[in-house]
Amino acid sequence: YASLRGIAAARNYDWKIPPEDYEHKDNYGLFETFEMSNVKPENLGFVDGQNVQENDHCFIPEFLTECPDNSNLEGYFQTEKYFEKIADQIHEDFTFKKGYLEPCKEYIESLDKPPIFLHVRQSDNIGREQYHPILPVSFFDECLKEFPDDTPCFVFTDDLEWCKSQDYFKQDRFLFNENVERYQYRTIDGLGKMQNTLLPQVDLCLMSLCSGAIIANSSFSWWGAWLQNNRGKVIAPDPKKWFGSAMTHLDTSDIVPDRWIIKEWSK
C-alpha cells in the first residue's frame, strides 16, 4: 500500500486498492487495524491494465519516473524509498484505531521508562532456514548493548513458549504480551506442525509506541519500527543475510533505511 501510494504520487496518478469481499480479506487487515483516512470510495476497486512486476527486492527508481498508468503492481516493494516523500501521509493512514491505540498507549505510559522492543521470529521459520534464517539470542544480546541497561524491553514473538524457556529472556527487563488472540484458520510450519497464526494488531501497535527497536529479518517488525516515526534508535540485522541460502539471488540492499543501525550476526 505505502509503495503504491508513493509511486502514484510521484507519477501524479490516481490509485486503487482491492476492496474487502469474500475473496479479499480487507486488504490484509488495513481497514480493520488502521484509520486509513486518505482512502476514499473511489480508491477501492481494481485496474484493468498491465501487470508491472518488481522481482528482486531492491529499489528500482524507474518505478517513480517511468511506471505506466493503468498498471497493477506486483512484488514486495520492501523499501521506504518508494514512499519516503509522502511518509507523513502514510503515518496518517497507519494511525491505529482507538480500540487498539488507547489500551496500548495506556499500558506503555504505565511503565517507569519508555520501552524498546525486540522481535524474535522463530516458529514459522523452523525447517525453513534456507529461506528465512533464525536470528540467534547472541544477536539480540549484542544489540541491547546499544541501549541503557535499565531500559524495559518488550519481546514480541510467534513462539512465546520458546522465548520464556530461554534463560536469557528471564531477566527482569523483558516484558511479554501474553494475551494475543489467534486467527481461526491454521498454517503449517517448516516441520509440518499446524498452528493458528497470532493476530498481529496489538503487537504491532505496541511496537509502534516503543522508543527504539531491535527488529528481526521480518517485514512485521520492520513496520513496527518504522511506525515509531524516528522516536528512538532502530537496530536491524545485516540485510545481506535477510534471506537464506536459497534466496541469495535477491538484492536486499535497500530494505533497511540508512538511518537505522545494522548489526552483523552469525550462528
List each model region and its residues.
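Leloir-type glycosyltransferase catalytic cores
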Residues: F243-K267
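Short beta-strand segments
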Residues: I17-P19, H119-R121, F154-T157, A236
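Secretory-pathway luminal glycosyltransferase catalytic domains
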Residues: Y22-T151
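N-terminal pre-catalytic "stem/leader" segment of glycosyltransferase-like enzymes
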Residues: Y1-E20, H24
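Residues within alpha-helical segments
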Residues: Y1, R5, A9, G99-E106, ...
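Donor-binding and catalytic core of enzymes assembling or modifying cell-surface/extracellular glycoconjugates
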Residues: P148-L250
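Surface-exposed helix-capping loop/turn segments at secondary-structure junctions
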Residues: R11-K16, F147-C153
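Amphipathic alpha-helical segments that form well-ordered structural scaffolds
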Residues: S3-I7, F139-E146, W162, L206
